[in-house]
A protein has these predicted regions:
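Non-heme Fe(II)-dependent double-stranded beta-helix
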Residues: 1-13, 19-112, 118-120, 235, ...
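Non-heme Fe(II)/2-oxoglutarate
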Residues: 33, 40, 44-52, 157-159, ...
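Short, charged/polar surface micro-motifs in flexible loops or helix N-caps
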Residues: 79, 89, 104-107, 124, ...
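Generic beta-strand structural signal
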Residues: 90-92, 96-97, 108-110, 125-131, ...
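Short, structured patches in soluble enzyme cores that scaffold and shape functional sites
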Residues: 98, 114, 131-135, 144-146
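A short beta-loop-beta micro-motif enriched in histidine and acidic residues
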Residues: 114-126, 185-186, 192, 213-214
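Short, conserved beta-strand element in jelly-roll/cupin
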Residues: 120-137, 191, 199, 221-225
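Double-stranded beta-helix
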Residues: 138-204
Length: 263
């Protein structure tokens, strides 16, 4: 359970670390689910690193319905309740899950970005939970710009070639050059052990380095009371084919793809 201090920090900074939020058994379930996903990726899977990268950055999305370990952790652990408390929401809806595996030696960074501009969702009550099943040292962990969730939406770009495939070029402000001016930003980051999780707002700017050792993580994206469907004229990441025909713009995401998971 998150306390008042963590709730205040989440709303101020847009990211908090919660230690020991998952039990050893729950971490094992997540690990088993990740390994199942690696062995049999969905058709949504991708490799987000270059062919000449000595490691590999694997991603896959929206597998909770096919991988029972994922669904069990989402529904029976405390992460949905914690997300609800942090968002100040009366209920929590699952948006999607996301597996991110950087194999040892991966050079590919995760560049600075916000998550929500890639999505088909509007609303301020949002929360992602990043759950590692391996120890994560400082150089490989997620970094966050404190308070950036309170600022504007920033231009989403492809991670490897920095193309604007979503919002039209010039329609959103570009990201500042955080790496060149790190001293000008309050950057939050935590070394993590299995069982620890980072909860962050979908507009919080975040990034991560490569991986000197294997880094397997499971991320769960939750939505709160004010989240609504925001159809886009382009392919979102992840994509929900046919949803635009079933939910009008501005409608709550009341759909089997997005089940209520708390209370």
């Amino acid at each position: 359970m998150v306390d008042a201090q963590l709730i205040e920090a989440f709303r101020r900074d847009g990211a908090v670390c919660v230690r020991g939020v998952l039990s050893a058994d729950e971490v094992m379930l997540v690990e088993q689910g990740i390994e199942r996903n690696l062995a049999a990726p969905s058709d949504r899977a991708l490799v987000a690193s270059r062919d000449n990268d000595p490691g590999r950055f694997f991603e896959d999305f929206c597998n909770w319905g096919a991988i029972g370990e994922f669904e069990r952790v989402i529904r029976t652990s405390g992460i949905a309740a914690d997300a609800g408390d942090l968002m100040g929401s009366d209920f929590v809806r699952l948006f999607h899950d996301h597996v991110l595996v950087k194999e040892a030696g991966t050079r590919q960074r995760t560049p600075w970005h916000q998550d929500q501009p890639y999505y088909n969702v509007d609303g301020s009550q949002t929360c992602s939970v990043w759950i590692p099943v391996d120890p994560v040292p400082r150089e490989s962990t997620l970094e966050f710009v404190a308070g950036s969730h309170l600022g504007p939406w920033l231009m989403p770009r492809t991670f490897m070639d920095q193309q604007a495939k979503w919002f039209p070029e010039g329609s959103l402000q570009d990201l500042p050059d955080i790496e060149a001016n790190r001293d000008e930003f309050e950057i939050l980051a935590w070394e993590l052990e299995p069982g620890d999780s980072v909860f962050f707002h979908m507009l919080t700017l975040h990034a991560a380095g490569g991986a000197t050792r294997r880094r397997r993580a499971f991320s769960v994206r939750f939505l709160g009371d004010d989240a609504t469907h925001a159809p886009r004229a382009w392919k979102t990441s992840p994509e929900f084919p046919g949803l635009v025909d079933e939910l009008p713009a501005g409608a709550p995401l009341e759909h089997p793809l997005f089940p209520l998971v708390w209370p």
